Amino acid sequence: MLPTSLKTLVLLGALLTGPLGPAGGQDAPSLPREVQRYDGWFNNLKYHQRGAAGSQLRRLVPANYADGVYQALQEPLLPNARLLSDAVSKGKAGLPSAHNRTVLGLFFGYHVLSDLVSVETPGCPAEFLNIYIPRGDPVFDPDKRGNVVLPFQRSRWDRSTGQSPSNPRDLTNQVTGWLDGSAIYGSSHSWSDTLRSFSGGQLASGPDPAFPRNSQNSLLMWMAPDPATGQGGPQGLYAFGAQRGNREPFLQALGLLWFRYHNLCAKRLAQEHPHWGDEELFQHARKRVIATYQNIALYQWLPSFLQKTPPEYSGYRPFMDPSISPEFVAASEQFLSTMVPPGVYMRNSSCHFREFPKEGSSSSPALRVCNNYWIRENPSLKTAQDVDQLLLGMASQISELEDRIVIEDLRDYWPGPDRYSRTDYVASSIQSGRDMGLPSYSQALQALGLEPPKNWSALNPKVDPQVLEATAALYNQDLSRLELFLGGLLESHGDPGPLFSNIILDQFVRLRDGDRYWFENTRNGLFSKEEIAEIRNTTLRDVLVAVSNVDPSALQPNVFFWQEGAPCPQPQQLTTEGLPQCVPVTVIDYFEGSGAGYGVTLLAVCCFPVVSLIIAWVVARFRNRERKMLLKKGKESLKKQTASDGVPAMEWPGPKESSYPVTVQLLPDRSLKVLDKRLTVLRTIQLQPTQQVNLILSSSHGRRTLLLKIPKEYDLVLMFNSEEDRDAFVQLLQDLCVCSTPGLRIAEMDEKELLRKAVTKQQRAGILEIFFRQLFAQVLDINQADAGTLPLDSSQQVREALTCELSRAEFADSLGLKPQDMFVESMFSLADKDGNGYISFREFLDILVVFMKGSPQDKSRLMFTMYDLDGNGFLSKEEFFTMMRSFIEISNNCLSKDQLAEVVESMFRESGFQDKEELTWEDFHFMLRDHDSDLRFTQLCVKGGAGGTGDIFKQSNACRVSFLTRTPGNRVMAPSPRLYTEALQEKMQRGFLAQKLKQFKRFVENYRRHIVCVTIFSAICAGLFADRAYYYGFASPPTDIEETTYVGIILSRGTAASISFMFSYILLTMCRNLITFLRETFLNRYIPFDAAVDFHRWIAMAAVVLAVVHSLGHAVNVYIFSVSPLSLMTCVFPSVFVNDGSKLPPKYYWWFFETVPGMTGVLLLLVLAIMYVFASHHFRRHSFRGFWLTHHLYVVLYALIIIHGSYALIQLPSFHIYFLVPAIIYVGDKLVSLSRKKVEISVVKVELLPSGVTYLQFQRPKTFEYKSGQWVRIACLSLGTNEYHPFTLTSAPHEDTLSLHIRAVGPWTTRLREIYSPPVGGTSARYPKLYLDGPFGEGHQEWHKFEVSVLVGGGIGVTPFASILKDLVFKSSMGTQMLCKKIYFIWVTRTQRQFEWLADIIREVEENGSRDLVSVHIYITQLAEKFDLRTTMLYICERHFQKVLNRSLFTGLRSVTHFGRPPFELFLDSLQEVHPQVHKIGVFSCGPPGMTKNVEKACQLINRQDRAHFVHHYENF
């Protein structure tokens, strides 16, 4: 009786293995209660994994590693493996076996080993113990290159081992460690199912029932290429249970033998038990075949191999460990290798030995071993009879002598790994022993209780002493270093030596006694005693006879020996003579034939942007054609609107500017007018009777162009539709000039030359600008470097330009005024001494000298002379009135005629001249007595020293100018204490380094928030890159990819992490609603939300650069992967590749186009090329719709990115980690935007204001609620319904309509200005409608929470305050109770021209502010070094005008205009004196960061005092 615990274990094993019932017969259950598993599990019920496939080898002797853990011993600790192979195993073939062992017994031994052990599978991560071939090796290095290295990849090991010296590395056995027929049925259930036919209990056969079917992809047969022919693939390889069962036809024949024997047993069982099903038949046949196999291997082959009989079987020993030892692997395989002959005979049952053809006319007596490795469709083994003849031939052939010699077929021509077709079997076995950490020969003897030899000569007396001497020399005469494998070979002669014999016998005994399913174990219930006896009497000869039907007399009784008198002796002991030569080693170039295709593929990918550019160019051409058609229609409609004598043409303004349509009118008064398409006069040319007019006609390019050269003017270049149109215009011009004395001179030249000779407006302006600078340099002693230099071009056109004179229009433009202004008329009349209607440069210089260097008396006299219109030496009231009127014209006519008369009277009365009707120059100068210092412009100096720019209009620091207030009687009062408002002047730094430093400081100052955000974002991206780069470079678990493509994987994975982050968080820059909300929070102080679009572009550009680097990294990876062997690729990509021995890696095109990451990567590059090209500024200008449509490919982009990373080729998908949160936010933001309906908004009013500003007033939707200072996005239906642009609202929340002031600075705003030109009929019906989206942005809403608020606007940053000021005035006029009692509004701007459009808004604020709630100051920072004559010459008038009328001459406003920068610190300090009872003052600034920083700094300095606290809120534009 079994113990209770053992019964329990047996029952557990039965449940786990699954008892099988009868398949459908009427017999009693035919299967035993337990069927042996295929994978070796649960053979031992206590130690379930013992002997299972994948279990580790069990050492007999402690491991011998270099580090005691896993590092193999290598040179120089041990000799070179190839040298050892040459020294120990080299020799001639042809010596017969000492005991006449047959070749059949030899290859049966190999078959048994394939059933027991398989450690050839390379391990992962890949580690190499390469074999370095000595220079000049006759086989592997015949060219004496000295760089030949045969790769040897270490075998697969148990990952739980190799951790410490107490747990060294152990290899794993890939097959079951039991003698259970796994070489016949496979080592797993799935493998066995693939081999079965599931019909009649048989194994599946091919077209010929005597052969199994060919190997299939689902069956992991080893498919190494034929080293002789290079042929590969599964075709011609049979499906066996042993993975390497097709290595040689001789091993293949034994596999076929057992295949046929199983099917024979199944047929017999089916005849005996016709009611059994397939499973019963298969399992009973398998059981019988395994038992027969065990019997032959242990009781027939092993004694013949060892010349020892194993001990009698004493029953199953459950505590016996049958695990295969690495020492057994080395001993058995290496000893068998000494017996392999160079060829194998084939014969029939009549003892006829076959001949085989070879090169030439001769024949070969045998199959050459070296040329039959992994051979496909062997012509000598086509039929079952051929297989039988091979088996009979092996039974008659005597193997090689069991000694140290290994024939060259193995030693020099063994199938090689990777790129090499051949390798050294012995050297590979030596490396394999070192890989397994085998002990030395002496250590193994001592561990097994055997006596080690004392010296080299005592090792084996039968070995040639020269061999021992050579071996000893390689080991430095140290016998203790001799390795187990070589020592075992040297001790063997005729039989295995004592070491190998003990190891092999011990292994087989443990396998038998520890196997619960051993056929002699009567307790397992597999066989009865009679069946066991029958099996014990079955021999391999019986199996051969049964499956081949040969005459038993054709075989000796024991086919493992050939004795004298046995049938069919071999013709001779085979040598290499008479056999075909072994095919030499070849080196495979994996990339051969792929270079051109790989290059073309990369070139095609690089051409994606080029193709996208071509597409964009085609789209742009179509858009330009449409634009030309529109222009053509416009010209046709323009013809109908122009006068009858108008001639349509295109004016060419210059070489880098686009031509535009004009209409040229020739008027009877000999004037020529050029009008634009809106009939606005662009230019008027007065043809004087005495002028010589030159007309140059083009003689090429259709003869459509003409050049009109008028003296003292820049040239006019016109391009007509045809030569006929041009000739018609020439005729009209000739008719106009017929009465002129000089007449019209006409010439012809080539069009290119004509355009080159033309003096354009831009050229004229450039020459005049430089000349003006030279004049000022002479007048003001300005440094020549600051003034600029004259052009060095001495061509005729430059000389003509320098000698020309200024027209009235050019003179007005130089002053920044209109030609029809009275001031221009007076000044021009005064300067034009010769009265020819032009001012020469000398005449201009005379005026300039007085203004710049003259004394106050000279300047007042010049002004007096200017307005002494009748020249009588007196300035009448009427002339004084005219002078004041000219000033008022400059200031936008802010005063009526009556108001101006009142001002003149008050000025006369204030000076004591109320009774005079005329003023002498002395009276006039007395009237300007208070402005003597202002008239001293002689202090204008830009040399940079004391008295430089900082002295312009210099005021005493002690002077304080108040915000002037008006009393009900219109008298001016100055409340005390007063505010300090004088402008601060800055000195210019002239040094190059100082200027660069200042520029850098200003840049950092202006973009500090941007820099911080970009730095943080870049740091995160760099950190992600560094993390992945470090991980794959140093810290990743060994996967071989970092060893295979170190640079490529670092670049590709590092950039992939950064790109994933960038493409994820770039979505946040497009969440407008979220940005609008966050701008109203404290985060706006730290994050420049207004720069979201710029940040979007920056991220996109950085991402595409990294994408290119990522692609380059993968280009390197693809090349390296294409030249790496399959064994290495299996380690790198275990989920993609299976190492089946085929060696050849996938080609480059597989990586590019047949993998998900490759194909999606190519598509991603294509999408990116399209999106980025169409998003360029140039193309957006030509076709915004194309940009908009292609940018919607971002949906495809993200889909491809997700698919690209989901394949997990290198690592698990990680894009979702970055993408999920931004995507949810972005989708939510989009849903909010989609919830707003697009309503067409009608435009109510349009005004074209100066400085290119367009005023739009449009309907306000009923549900539109906003705060003053917010902005909206509008789309003009005529310019595209999807193209939105943001603008700040300048209307107040209480107004019924919305308004915008849009400055034309880009293509869209320019086109908008053209489209909204005032219609002819004066109605708004023809105005295109708008789409409105918003409001967005932050409103400065806390101004009303302070009793005193200061609003500071810089440049265009004043626009939010326009809405706030109007809102403020409305609330105050409505009597709304507000905490705020006083508003100070300061606007800092470069030049007065920038605020012309805002004057009406500020004037409205001033007129409606009944309680003087708002005080306005304007600071103009542009100084006279810019040579703005108007700023210089009108300064005196501004101060006097402000004093007399309490209005600015420049703006017509009560606000004071200053020149320079506001003194924020002094102003805020004085504000505390004006409002001593106020304890908290709000400061709101909006503009460039430099200005808001100065305000912030001033507030911080003032807040250090124990007085009023200034709370600063700012917003940067």
From Swiss-Prot:
Induction: By forskolin, thyrotropin and insulin. Down-regulated by the antithyroid drug methimazole. The chain crosses the membrane at residues 600-620, 1011-1031, 1047-1067, 1101-1121, 1155-1175, 1186-1206, 1208-1228. Expressed in colon, duodenum, rectum and thyroid. Ca(2+) 2 binds at residues 868, 870, 872, 879. Ca(2+) 1 binds at residues 832, 834, 836, 838, 843. Glycans are attached at residues 100, 348, 455, 537. GO terms for cellular component: anchoring junction; apical part of cell; apical plasma membrane; cell leading edge; cell surface; cytosol; endoplasmic reticulum; NADPH oxidase complex. Its main location: membrane. This is Dual oxidase 2.
